[in-house]
Amino acid sequence: MTTYVSGDWVATRISDPNFLIIDTRYSMRHLMGHLQNAVNVPPPKLRDQQGQLLSPDEFAALFGAAGLGDSITPILYDSYDGRNSAFVAWILEYLGRNDIHIMEIVYDEWKGQGRDVFYRPVPRTARKFTPRINSSVRASLEYVSQTDGLTLVDTRSLEEFQGQSDADQIPGHIPGAISVVWQTLVGQDGNLICEEDEARRIIQAAKIDVSNTVVTYCKVGARAAVGYQTLKRLGFDVKLFDGSYAEWEKSGLPVENPNSD
């Protein structure tokens, strides 16, 4: 389970050896300043050269080398839109962790409040990380294409959903999907996610039924993680299709394109 926590909550634990601060921003951002004791684990490190998620053993090596042991509690933080932290948190959920925290304010807000930031790399203490795969949070291409009664939530831009984007080989969306643009779920005034009441209003307006299993997707998974974390927070049974539309459009499965003749 992933919980969003305040900057004050993080500040009181930032030097506690039972917690590990994980900067999920891209490496260049990390080098330009980071929280005390933070190690850098951005999403690109979670995939191989073919764009596939690492194996459980590779994840164990990655997170163990970063200092995340089985008895250490992770605290993630991010920049303005929350995609990276949401995706890294989902990965940790998939690996069986249920003690994940994300700082709800963005790094720039932390810095703007006059809190300490640091610039030197943090020495890492390697620890044992044991994956305990939780397959219930992950949806495969086979699952999405063969399971009846799913609610598919497309978190890409409206242009992508409507088949108006040149970024897709086969423009459109997975048949039957509902559009909820991920940016509508991002918070304001230095917060990563929108208020729970606003998130509920957006989800209700999209007519997403809480009694159905929901699968979020985007192009390659990161934007879908924002939708995943939002829906999880609202009590939905939700999975993330990490192959997302990039895998779907290559599969030869049907595509719905409202923009086609």
Question: Which residues are covered by each model-predicted region?
Answer:
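N-terminal intrinsically disordered, low-complexity segments enriched in P/E/S/T
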Residues: 1-58, 150-167, 173-181, 191-198
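Active-site neighborhoods of enzymes that stabilize oxyanions during catalysis
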Residues: 2-6, 108-172, 253-261
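Loop/turn elements at helix/coil->beta-strand transitions in domains of secreted/extracellular proteins
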Residues: 17-19, 71-73, 149-150, 210-212
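Structural recognition of the beta-strand scaffold that forms the well-ordered cores
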Residues: 22, 40, 73-76, 152-154, ...
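A short, acidic, amphipathic alpha-helical segment used as a generic capping/interface helix at domain edges
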Residues: 194-210
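Cysteine-dependent PTP/DSP-like catalytic domain, specifically the C-terminal lobe
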Residues: 237-261
